[in-house]
Design a protein with these regions (language model features):
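Cysteine protease catalytic domains with a Cys-His-Asp triad
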Residues: 1-105, 109-115
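Cysteine protease-like catalytic core of ubiquitin/ubiquitin-like
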Residues: 66-212
Length: 214
């Protein structure tokens, strides 16, 4: 008997029971859950929306390990230069070829503003990682290789395990805001209430997709 069965097979993402269990309690969210949610945004919530790009943790790790001159290998197939807003799930893992790390944050590129915004629920924790990746990506995304980097104020977590949940809440807020306002600046904050409800919200999404045969 498989003790860790596949719960959901959604496009390019497989969720096992151990992944889904992370949503049921006070647990740190792993790469698989965040990748699933980013894919859900792309394939369901914002299906057909060409102005938004959601880049999964696995691809972000590859970008961190790749020379600026070679980023096109990963980003050209995603049409990154044609997107107005690019969302990257950033981890502080220093081992470039495997999953890991202890903290998630969100890096967002706003093409209309030529600016990277970093949203960190433990402000300063992933600053070094975000600034380094920003400098590399600007050489690819902006023909002039120039742009700004802003460590944005954001709602702060009060525990050691909700950073991934905060990333997903930030994505929800910013994706909607950016489409309505054509910018990231002035976006405001997510709320503690929204953060508290996010795990159950994702579980509901998973059950809904299961009912559709995924």
């Amino acid at each position: 008997m498989n003790k860790n069965p596949v719960i959901l097979n959604f496009n390019d993402t497989l969720l096992h029971q151990s992944d889904v269990d992370l949503l049921n309690g006070p647990h740190w969210l792993n790469d698989n859950i965040i990748t699933f949610y980013f894919e859900y945004l792309e394939k369901v919530a914002y299906l057909g929306e060409k102005n938004l790009l959601f880049i999964s943790p696995e691809v972000v790790q590859c970008l961190k390990a790749t020379k600026a001159s070679e980023l096109s290998v990963f980003l050209d197939p995603l049409a990154a230069k044609q997107r107005k807003f690019v969302f990257l799930a950033l981890n502080n893992c220093e081992i470039m070829d495997k999953a890991g790390g202890s903290h998630w944050s969100l890096l967002v590129y706003s093409q209309p503003e030529e600016t990277f915004y970093h949203f960190d629920s433990l402000k300063g924790t992933n600053y070094k990682q975000a600034a380094k990746l920003c400098g590399k990506l600007l050489k690819y995304l902006n023909p002039n290789g120039t742009g700004d980097f802003i460590e944005n104020d954001a709602l702060q977590q009060n525990n050691s395990y909700d950073c991934g949940v905060f990333v997903l809440c930030h994505v929800d807020l910013l994706a909607n805001y950016s489409l309505q306002n054509n910018r990231i600046s002035g976006c405001g904050w997510t709320t503690q209430e929204y953060v508290k409800s996010k795990r159950s919200s994702i579980l509901h999404i998973i059950k809904n997709l299961q009912s559709k045969g995924y």
